[in-house]
């Protein structure tokens, strides 16, 4: 059975749905194109949860009737009623779970593409190799989901690691799945650079940002400082005789981005701007969240960049996600992009936390 707070919220949403239907049938609303469009959008957003709630109430009514038939003196009728009770109980469980998911406020960024940024942290060359392992893991996961991965900017090391790599991941549900990956990832293993066979701990930081439509962020030309320089390769040597690499500084925030992977200055500038827009949107949203958190005194799923979220332990073939105390002994599978088990568990936890807020708000 759904909790009273959920039923109360569903009743309110259903009432809102009915009122919207009434509004949309009024001649004055039909004639007002903008208002009609706005109300139609609201109605569409509530349609699925309204239909689910109707199915839930219908199943609840049928279950009550089937339970009454269990008292019948007719043996055949009782057997049929028992089957119906079992079927309806299962159906109601499924509908309850679906309704809970729909009660959680939607993240407007869930439908967006992703700007993925991985930076090597503590651990020198080994940290850079780990950053490359993480990038490969996300590439494999994207491949499995049918998403497209394009490198926007990268800084490779001599051994094939990454000091930093930034990529655009395009595809349905990319942000809704990958947003849980932001934070510090830690690896424990014997590095290829280690001759004595000792286990080292290294880190890499992952940031997952929604791709931003440039119309969402207003930047004045005078707020940008654009510099060009010659692109350099893994060993630091120059790989280009002309200044094709681009560095852009957003003066008000101090955010700096650079790109040198493309052959032309124009292409590098376009890619750098794409990264900058995503970082600025993230910067402003985080500031807004901090203000809300101060008022609310609590914050759901902060995804702090400095938070250690996961450990990859090679000697034990173990992956531990510290946010939900989930441990899996299938490290190689995870590194091959089998991330759904972890992401599903994180998503379930987020829904649970947000439902607690729904309960409080009633």
UniProtKB/Swiss-Prot annotation:
Main localization of the protein described in the UniProt heading: cytoplasm
InterPro entries in the cross-refs: PCRF, Pep_chain_release_fac_I, Pep_chain_release_fac_I_sf, Prokaryotic/Mito_RF, RF-1
GO CC terms of this entry: cytoplasm
Pfam families per record: PCRF, RF-1
Subcellular location: Cytoplasm
Modified residue annotations for N5-methylglutamine: 237
Record note on modification: Methylated by PrmC. Methylation increases the termination efficiency of RF1.
GO MF annotation: an example: translation release factor activity, codon specific
Alphabetized SUPFAM superfamilies for the sequence: Release factor
Keyword Protein biosynthesis among UniProt keywords: yes
Annotated keywords: Cytoplasm, Methylation, Protein biosynthesis
Protein family membership: Belongs to the prokaryotic/mitochondrial release factor family.
Function: Peptide chain release factor 1 directs the termination of translation in response to the peptide chain termination codons UAG and UAA.
Name of the protein in question: Peptide chain release factor 1
């Amino acid at each position: 059975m759904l909790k009273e707070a959920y039923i109360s919220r569903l009743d309110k949403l259903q009432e809102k749905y009915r009122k919207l239907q009434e509004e949309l049938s009024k001649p004055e609303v039909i004639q007002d194109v903008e208002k009609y469009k706005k109300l139609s959008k609201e109605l569409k957003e509530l349609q699925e949860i309204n239909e689910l709630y109707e199915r839930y109430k219908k199943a609840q009514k049928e279950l009550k009737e089937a339970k009454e038939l269990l008292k019948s003196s007719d043996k055949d009728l009782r057997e049929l009623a028992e089957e119906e009770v079992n079927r309806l109980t299962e159906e109601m469980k499924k509908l309850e779970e679906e309704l809970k998911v729909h009660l959680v406020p939607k993240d407007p960024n869930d439908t967006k593409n992703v700007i993925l940024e991985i930076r090597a942290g503590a651990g020198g060359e080994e940290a850079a190799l780990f950053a490359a392992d993480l990038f490969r893991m996300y590439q494999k996961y994207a491949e499995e989901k049918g998403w497209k991965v394009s490198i926007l900017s990268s800084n490779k090391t001599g051994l094939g690691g990454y000091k930093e790599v930034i990529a655009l991941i395009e595809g349905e549900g990319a942000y809704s799945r990958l947003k849980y990956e932001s934070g510090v990832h830690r690896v424990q293993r014997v590095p290829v650079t280690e001759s004595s066979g000792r286990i080292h701990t290294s880190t890499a930081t992952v940031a997952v940002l929604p791709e931003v439509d440039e119309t969402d962020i207003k930047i004045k030309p005078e707020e940008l400082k654009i510099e060009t320089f010659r692109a350099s390769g893994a060993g630091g040597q120059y790989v280009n005789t002309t200044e094709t690499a681009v560095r852009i500084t957003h003066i008000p925030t101090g955010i700096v981005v650079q790109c040198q992977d493309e052959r032309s200055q124009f292409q590098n500038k376009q890619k750098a701007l794409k990264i900058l827009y995503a970082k600025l949107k993230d910067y402003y949203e985080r500031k807004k969240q901090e203000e809300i958190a101060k008022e609310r005194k609590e914050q759901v799923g902060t995804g702090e960049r400095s938070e250690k979220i996961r450990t990859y332990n090679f000697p034990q073939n173990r992956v531990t996600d510290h946010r939900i105390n989930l441990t899996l002994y299938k490290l190689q599978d995870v590194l091959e992009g089998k991330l759904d088990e972890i992401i599903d568990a994180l998503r379930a936890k987020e829904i649970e936390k947000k439902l607690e807020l729904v309960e409080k708000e009633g």
